[in-house]
Amino acid sequence: MESLFPAPYWEVLYGSHFQGNLSLLNETVPHHLLLNASHSAFLPLGLKVTIVGLYLAVCIGGLLGNCLVMYVILRHTKMKTATNIYIFNLALADTLVLLTLPFQGTDILLGFWPFGNALCKTVIAIDYYNMFTSTFTLTAMSVDRYVAICHPIRALDVRTSSKAQAVNVAIWALASVVGVPVAIMGSAQVEDEEIECLVEIPAPQDYWGPVFAICIFLFSFIIPVLIISVCYSLMIRRLRGVRLLSGSREKDRNLRRITRLVLVVVAVFVGCWTPVQVFVLVQGLGVQPGSETAVAILRFCTALGYVNSCLNPILYAFLDENFKACFRKFCCASSLHREMQVSDRVRSIAKDVGLGCKTSETVPRPA
């Protein structure tokens, strides 16, 4: 059987519909249209509702958390460090992709794409931008940690917030190399009286599909993870080799704390994205999911990748004292503001009641 990789691969990344029934794989259908045999009908309604519910929960929780992270970094001057500038970029990418989940969830539940061509292109582009900006940002954070730990003198000139901002701009520009073309190739197409959101692979699909997919796998996952691994291997060797990295124990403790935070964020990212990346790679080699169980696993692996986008704010709150303090301050300020509003409202009502009573006492009673 010839490889049918392109269709399931695009399905994984932005939630269109792919072929899960092996009997249909033998039909003569162009590769870029195989997504149109909706797998949503192939999955039980209960499973679809579960996946959509997970998408919505991730969307709501992730948006609240990531927006709070961005607010804290913008609001407090002390939070505008090089590491936090990268964290802001990560939160921005996560926020954008989380905004697409209601549309993807609707697509899964209905079994077709109801939102038109422009939104289809937008969702596809955001998914790819998120994939590349996230891995590139984590790589930049790891290199930044490596410089801070292994080259502390050089770090004084290299690790500035302005240079971190420039790196973030370069990351988005580099991600556009993939984001713009897939947005152009993406479209909402009508097939069998259903509208499907998909990416049309250029002909010949047998060649360009696997080549493009393997390139994405390498540049969005394998190569960044290798760079990150090398950076942390060198950092661990450095941390074990010296007891004091800087002249101050407090500064040394802060360096180790931030390094641990970045390491945990990277580890969680790799843990969340490895299953779907491996699944996609297996499909690229020509092995297709042909059972309800395989389709369900693929869907949940995809959802796990999105779950990562709402986990980062939780990690910051637990592992970084500065974020924890800012989050606590924000929550306390919000609570105090609500209490003051309630108190002002009560005083206003009491004042009105008092004036009313006083007025009624001064008005002469009728004889």
Swiss-Prot record:
This is Nociceptin receptor. One of its GO terms (biological process) is negative regulation of adenylate cyclase-activating G protein-coupled receptor signaling pathway. It is found in: Cell membrane; Cytoplasmic vesicle. PROSITE patterns: G_PROTEIN_RECEP_F1_1, G_PROTEIN_RECEP_F1_2. Disulfide bonds join 120-197. Phosphorylation at Ser-360 requires GRK3. Keywords: Behavior, Cell membrane, Cytoplasmic vesicle, Disulfide bond, G-protein coupled receptor, Glycoprotein, Lipoprotein, Membrane, Palmitate, Phosphoprotein, Receptor, Transducer, Transmembrane, Transmembrane helix. A lipid is attached at residue 331 (S-palmitoyl cysteine).
